[in-house]
Amino acid sequence: MSTNKSSIEKITLGSFLIALGVVYGDIGTSPLYVMKSIINGNGGLESITPDFILGVLSLIFWTMTLLTTIKYVLITLKADNKGEGGIFSLYTLIRRRAKWLIIPAMVGGSALLADGMLTPAVTVTSSIEGLKILPSFNDIFGNNQDIIIIIVLVILSFLFFIQHFGTEIIGKIFGPVMFIWFAFLAILGIVNLSGNLYLLKALSPHYAIKILFSPNNHLGFFILGGVFLSTTGAEALYSDLGHVGRKNIYLTWPLVKICLLLNYFGQAAWILSQKNNAKLYGIESLNPFFQMMPSWLLLFGVLISTLAAIIASQALISGSYTLVSEAIKLNLFPRLQCLYPSNSKGQIYMPAINRILWIACIAIVLYFRSSDNMEAAYGLSITVTMLMTSILLFNYLLKRKTPLPIALIILVFFSSLEFSFLISSAVKFEKGGFVSVLIALCILSIMYIWIKGHYIKMSLLDYIPIENYKNQLKELKNDVDRPKYATNLVYLTSSEKSKRIERKIMYSILDKRPKRADVYWFVNVIVTDEPYTSEYTVNTFGTDYMVKVQLKLGFRVNQKLNVFLRQIVCELINNGDIKVQNKKYTTLHNRNVGDFRFILINECLSSESKLESWNSIIIRSKLFIKKFTVSPAKWFGLESSEIEVENVPLILGSTRM
């Protein structure tokens, strides 16, 4: 683990390009739609004044400075969990401070996943709509939005299709492409800004405050909803910390910010130069980003912006896989199949999530049809995530012994700022924002059902001391009249106590059909707060035939149980804790480990269960969701092992622990 961390912290040309390709896709494509959204929302080009433009630029500059630079880059990036970032990594650092902290973690994670469904749709659509300005495109298709939609659907479908094969090869071009993209943004901005340097006055916060109360601002306070789009990628920047390291973000962010600001200022200069151009007044959804390009550069501009949009979408898709994977390991989300299409660290693929994201993105494009309509829905959910991150960050600062007044100032300042953006974005609800809210609520409901169902079951399950059955297990082990069921018989237990297991496990061994084995294993898997922990403790109860294993794995470690267990068995044999398990017939010389059989207990709710109506609904809902999840055999990597599934009635409410 230390090697991985040190390698990503190195500052090289390669790490510089990787950071550009991985971290800044979302925030880097914001110039495609931020100014467009604000200008069209204020009544179009004809309603623009110099004071309005200065105010907008000032709002964008200070939003990026306060939220992205100060909150995320300078403060939040320091809240890393062994080099890993993101809202769930932050939660694992502080979850022992208070149980209620799971609420902002779940709410923030749900909203971030909802944002991941909107981002690919809005960025790709915004870039492809640039084709409408091309004379050759207009001559053939005119102002036909259906053609734009078809192209967007093809690109998105292709992007989701290739996830199955991994993106390691094409991922190598992400960095160079984003380098060209940011250079393009800067050059385009400088060319249009030259001669309009008075716009640099917008760096003063005076203009940001003034525009909120100016009669030239037809949106009033709600202009912040459009301005916020310039910083939506800040949360993704924190989530990708583990891929590139803090030092690489410190190095690249100032350069990225300068490129973005130069482009925003260039767009502003073009807007002021064209505000009296009546020919542009009738253009629907005027986009300054494409309009300020010379005609000979338009095709390249559309191509490079589309590539940047695809890279931004890829980053959000990969981020969604990672986010769901972490939620699963923290028992906040149902277990779904995880595949590893490449050898790169952190490269995972989740087929179910990929299908859901693809269907959601396609549905969003078909429902909203244009980037204008999508922008109306975009940004609302991410403000919620930022607010939740601020709450978790406050608790992290207190844990790190930050003086309470300083921690409170940070919490109040950034929460007030983010709450202002949330209120200003709330106007988007009826214009399409309800879509992201509904998506977030669906995800949150699944999380709530899953974790609440777990707590209900854990509080009512019947646990028993293993030592009470030591003699019976010894007699069963030595009962030669019974055929040997397995050399090593393995059960998974949820009990974290070293001397207790669920009664249903002992019932399976002794009552259902007595199972004779040389060694009985009771394995409890605990997910730790650190990302890459891999350690275990054992309790043999003074025997060589009963072992309770507590396997501690980091929240980013694959839970391949057979691999870990075989290693543990070998170590216990070498230490003399259990006997050598010689096999009479084997193709391997000197093999001293016998066969394994895993018993997986499948629970179904019994009609005898006595639960309150709400708890009963939760448990039944969880069991229903469980039908669509990956089997324990696949989750724990036991597909090639000998397993047996036993159905056991889940009787809850009659016995308390």
Curated annotation (Swiss-Prot):
Membrane topology note: Multi-pass membrane protein
Q: Name one Pfam family in it.
A: K_trans
Transmembrane segments annotated in the record for this chain? 15-35, 48-68, 100-120, 147-167, 173-193, 219-239, 251-271, 292-312, 348-368, 378-398, 403-423, 431-451
According to the UniProt record, one GO cellular component term is: plasma membrane
Q: Does the keyword Cell membrane apply?
A: yes
Q: Which reaction does it catalyse?
A: K(+)(in) + H(+)(in) = K(+)(out) + H(+)(out)
Molecular function as annotated in GO: potassium ion transmembrane transporter activity; symporter activity
**Main localization of the protein?**
membrane
The record's keywords, sorted A to Z, are: Cell membrane, Ion transport, Membrane, Potassium, Potassium transport, Symport, Transmembrane, Transmembrane helix, Transport
Q: Where does the record say this protein resides?
A: Cell membrane
Q: What does this protein do?
A: Transport of potassium into the cell. Likely operates as a K(+):H(+) symporter.
The family assignment reads: Belongs to the HAK/KUP transporter (TC 2.A.72) family.
Protein's name in the database:
Probable potassium transport system protein Kup
Say which species the protein is native to: Clostridium perfringens (strain SM101 / Type A)
Lineage here is: Bacteria, Bacillati, Bacillota, Clostridia, Eubacteriales
Task: Quote the gene name from the UniProt entry.
Answer: kup
